[in-house]
A protein has these predicted regions:
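FIC/Doc superfamily catalytic core
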Residues: 1-183, 187-316
Length: 316
């Protein structure tokens, strides 16, 4: 079963092929993108979990080692730990060996070092947990080891032959669903999703704090058995990050971003309708910080397909 709309999947495949044809990327581009990613990923992944550090405060901690007045040590540790965690994921991505549950435990230990309670880093939970604000009740602790073995096997073998983006989304939801740790589950899940992407030469993604409500809604729908929203969510972010690479190396044919209002005028439709399609993952739109946007080339492809569907069929 395919979980990502074909038009969105085609846009990702086209960008991926172009990025892959440009490898190796210029070292200065890799360094610049890596620096931005580390800061923005660290800020957003922690902010999604309630950390109150600003983007600028996060940058000061990462780049200058400064402490920040008025913030808890836990919040500072959560920021400080992430560059090492990202580096660990990068090393796993370049390693051909099979991922193990031990690797996931090591990742959790790095992420939550000094930020979680004693004896709660790098170990699976031994008690029951609840997810604040969610109707989902994680499985009992005695099932967690078996479920984690199954999740890691799924990462290694992809038995359902999902696309890379779909596999990343399923892994992201899978770890949050199992909730194997007392704390840090969302952070580790987003890092593992990026590991799946990076192992197959896709770009790691940053889920924005502003997208928290949509993100949680997608996870809730996945809990209920509908994986399409979370797969579309991850796919839209992957498209955005592939475009960021192409803009960095100035290889962006037809990639000028249009607001949905501009796009609606060009496509002779309404911005509300395009927004509905974007929210459902039916068009290759991305969140650009201000709202939804779509690349000119993707809009033109959508408009052509729309005209083709509406064209009267020739009589036989």
């Amino acid at each position: 079963m395919t979980y990502v709309n074909p038009s969105l999947q085609r846009a990702i495949a086209q960008r991926w092929k172009l990025v892959d044809s440009l490898r190796p990327l210029p070292p200065e581009v890799v360094a610049s993108l890596g620096k931005v990613f580390r800061t923005e990923f660290t800020y957003n992944t922690n902010a999604l979990e309630g950390n109150t550090l600003t983007l600028r405060e996060t940058q000061l901690i990462l780049e200058e080692g400064q402490t920040v007045g008025g913030k808890s040590l836990r919040e500072v540790y959560e920021a400080r730990n992430h560059p090492e965690a990202i580096g660990y994921v990068e090393s796993l991505a370049s390693d051909a060996r099979r991922l193990s549950v031990s690797d996931v435990l090591t990742l959790h230990q790095i992420v939550m070092k000094d930020a979680a309670g004693p004896g709660r880093t790098g170990v699976l939970r031994r008690g029951e947990v609840r997810i604040s604000g969610s109707r989902h009740v994680p499985p009992p602790a005695y099932e967690v080891p078996r479920l984690m073995d199954a999740l890691v096997d799924d990462i290694n073998d992809n038995p359902d032959e999902r696309t890379t983006v779909e596999q990343a989304a399923v892994v992201l939801h899978g770890l949050v669903h199992v909730h194997p740790f007392y704390d840090g589950n969302g952070r580790v899940a987003r890092l593992l999703a990026n590991l799946v992407l990076m192992r197959r030469r896709y770009q790691p993604i940053v889920v924005l704090k502003q997208d928290r409500r949509r993100y949680l809604t997608c996870l809730e729908k996945a809990d209920a058995g509908d994986l399409r929203p979370i797969c579309a969510f991850v796919a839209q972010y992957e498209l955005k990050h592939l475009d960021m690479v192409l803009r960095a190396v100035e290889q962006t044919p037809g990639a000028r971003l249009l607001s949905l209002e501009e796009a609606a005028e060009r496509a002779s439709t309404s911005a509300g309708y395009l927004r509905l399609l974007a929210n459902k993952g039916y068009i290759p739109a991305v969140k650009d910080g201000r709202g939804w946007a779509i690349a000119e080339g993707d809009l033109d492809a959508y408009a052509r397909a729309r005209r083709k569907r509406r064209a009267p069929k020739r009589p036989r």
